[in-house]
Structure formats: structure tokens, C-alpha cells
Amino acid sequence: MEQHLDAYCMHLRSERQVSPHTLEAYRRDLSKVLAYCQKARLSSWNDLDIQHLRSFTARQHQQGQSSRSLARMLSAVRGFYKYLNREGLCQHDPANGLSPPKGERRLPKTLDTDRTAQLLDGGVEDDFLAHRDQAIMELLYSSGLRLSELTGLNLDQLDLRDGLVQVLGKGSKTRVLPVGSKARQALETWLPLRALTNPQDDAVFVSQQGKRLGPRAVQLRIKTAGERELGQNLHPHMLRHSFASHLLESSQDLRAVQELLGHADIKTTQIYTHLDFQHLATVYDSAHPRAKRKGAADD
């Protein structure tokens, strides 16, 4: 069974050309299913049926797995069994018709515009790391990049003269995004410093040794910046969420935000409308003369 899983992961990497992050997530999810099969003494993937999978997902949910994580796991199982069926190794899909337990969808965490300005306008020390980190944060917020898109960015994808960046998103789909003036300035300051490291490839963001920055390194640097400037835990995706929320709040153009974020389904983008409504409700409660306030007596 394990060799079939290895072959599928190789297929995803070489034929489907999925990103390393996606491949790691698929392998992690399918390895959990494999461990369950081994514990249940199933001798082949053909032995796993919908009852087994329903029991497995219920147990995972009881152990704290979110509905979103379980939905991703079931999607991985469906993709795997599609491959097994095509290769003649199986004749069914145990995940067919199976849905994850429903759970409350958590709203993404964002910074408001004042906190974002506090983070980005906090002053940059004149050194390599500070200028690099500033360029990273400005670009994440300016263009709404995913972490994987940022760390995979190469020099030929940047056009600072016209203020554009081309990124390779999920499903190997490319999109061209605007780069704001603040991000352009930060990048123009950073790129000459980058050249001094004698970079080993065309990565836009490199370490002091000239090596491409990985996701974990970026996460740690942004976490440090958040603690220093805001006194809070900050992660790269929070800047992407803030980009989406602030843009939607200003433009009210859901389709445009969907395109900029690279969402295949507009339902994924619609979660930001809930954030916008929360903001409007807060403004209403604080500003409307007849708004119902906590502690106010009923008329």
C-alpha cells in the first residue's frame, strides 16, 4: 500500500507539477489514512470502504481536526483513488458521497489600516535584514501574495518600471498583479543589497548567504516584526487577508478581489464580506445616534 502512495506522490510532483507545499499536505493526509488502514489490518487500498473512511473522519474530528482540514483530506483521498482506478489498482472510491462534519468557519485574522500602517511605517534600520524584511512585508500587503508565491518569486517576474509582478499560484496558474508605490520603493532599496550576496539563483528574496528564503524563514522574520512593532503574533497570510479586507472595504468589488487573490471559487473570497460587515457594524454601533449599545436600557 505504501508503494502505491509513493508512486502517487511522484505522479503529483512530476506529472501534475503540484507545489512542494501542496505535495507535503497530500502526503501527510494520505499517510494518516494509510496508518488507519494498517491498524485496521486492511491489506490493500481496495479494502478501504466508505464505512471505514466515515469512522476515520469521525475519530479525527473528535481529536480536534477542523472540518476544513477533513475536507482537504477527503479531497486528497478522492484524487488518490482516481489515480488508483486509472492505473487499474482499484475499482471504487470510498470517499464518493462522503462529506466532512460541518463546523463553524473561522474568519481570517486581519490588521486594521492603522495597525498595518504602524507595522509598515515603523521605521527601517539601515541594514540588510531590515530592508529585505520591509520589502517582503510591503509586497505581501501591496499585492496580496500567498507565502508560497512570495518565496517562489524570481527576478524575471518583477517589472518595477510598470509596477507589476507575475506570480505562479495554485494549480500552476499565473496572474499579474499591481505593485504599489511603497512596495516598489522598498524593492528598489532591497535589490542592490540582494546583489551583494552573490545569489545562487534568481530568487528575489535571499538570505545573507545568497540562498533562496524558505517559507519558515519568512514566517519567523514576520513574527519578529509583529512582536517588535505591534506586540502581537503576526504571520504572512495575515497581510494577505488584510490586503483583501481593506481592498474590498474600499472598492466593494468582490470579483476584482477574487481575481487579485487568485481564488478559483468566489465563495472563498466571500468570507471577506463577513469581515467588512463586522467593520460596518462596529461603525454603526459607535456612530449611529439610535444604535443599541451594550448596557443601554430598553425603551
Curated annotation (Swiss-Prot):
Protein known as: Tyrosine recombinase XerC
Family: Belongs to the 'phage' integrase family. XerC subfamily.
Domain (Core-binding (CB)) ranges: 1-85
Catalytic center residues: 146, 170, 237, 240, 263, 272 (o-(3'-phospho-dna)-tyrosine intermediate)
Keyword Transit peptide assigned: no
A molecular-function term among this protein's GO annotations: DNA binding
Subunit structure: Forms a cyclic heterotetrameric complex composed of two molecules of XerC and two molecules of XerD.
Domain Tyr recombinase: residue ranges: 106-285
Domain of life: Bacteria
Subcellular localization, as worded in the UniProt entry: Cytoplasm
InterPro entries: CB, DNA_brk_join_enz, Integrase-like_cat_sf, Integrase_catalytic, Integrase_recombinase_N, Integrase_SAM-like_N, Recomb_XerC, Tyrosine_recombinase_XerC/XerD
Entries under Pfam families matching the protein: Phage_int_SAM_1, Phage_integrase
Natural source organism: Pseudomonas syringae pv. tomato (strain ATCC BAA-871 / DC3000)
Keywords per UniProt: Cell cycle, Cell division, Chromosome partition, Cytoplasm, DNA integration, DNA recombination, DNA-binding
Xref: PROSITE patterns: CB, TYR_RECOMBINASE
GO cellular component, one term: cytoplasm
GO biological process entries: cell division; chromosome segregation; DNA transposition
Role of this protein: Site-specific tyrosine recombinase, which acts by catalyzing the cutting and rejoining of the recombining DNA molecules. The XerC-XerD complex is essential to convert dimers of the bacterial chromosome into monomers to permit their segregation at cell division. It also contributes to the segregational stability of plasmids.
SUPFAM superfamilies noted in UniProt: DNA breaking-rejoining enzymes (SSF56349)
Keyword Membrane: no
Gene3D superfamilies xref list: 1.10.150.130, Intergrase catalytic core (1.10.443.10)
